[in-house]
Amino acid sequence: MDQVDKKILFNLLRDGRISQRQIAQNVGISAQTLGYRINRLISDGIIKGYSLIVSPLLDGQVEGFAAFKSDRQYNGGVSFITRCLEEITLYGFRGDRMEDVEEKIAAAGRELGDPVMKYFPPTAQVEMNLNSNDMEIIRLMRGDPRMPVTDIAAKLDLPYMTVKRRLNLLLKNRLIGVVSQIDLSGGDVVIYSIFSHAVDAVTKLLEPQTIFAIRDSTAGVLFCYSENLKGARESISRVRSVDSDADVMVLYEYQFFT
């Protein structure tokens, strides 16, 4: 695992649908070299696959997040799990109402102990007019999150530009997203999450390293990447300079179930 491999992984972590041509340009290697390296990362089990994340808004649901300090495993209807070195595990929960989410967190707490952190993003509205084609695009991408636009268009018998435009809108409005599943231990990279109430300042500091974020105007959780622990420590120190109360968790495993 060298610096080129790490840059490839970073590109995939930031955008699970990024094209190999774009990765090659970003990293500064040929398409042939990139293809060889990606195939090796897959065969070595570093790149494990890709997951399509679908916003709960599409099902009329709400979500909340809670972190527990426990080494026990809990799989009671969660939307994602991120396990951290500090024996803290962050879970995502979804429900039809906020009361349902709170009850799911309480149920987890009865097994794992009281949560050390909870975050409930404010309920938002879908900011685009969805149609049946959008639902069909999502259906196909559940089976293959990186399916090329040309293949989606062919399967749905729709114009290429129509599919490209609708897919870009779904991604832009964060109604869907594609997450690369990376073996963090084998990949020798660091992913860490930061929960902060100084979210605007922290977001600005961490923008170059941010993979994705769940936030509103007052607080948020940012998931960030570093090529090594030294870089992660430096970024965390900068965060502490603007928010001494920020919660930091270094991830060693993550799973998405939506």
Describe each region flagged by the PLM.
Residues 1-258:
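A compositional/biophysical signature of low hydrophobicity enriched in polar/charged and small residues
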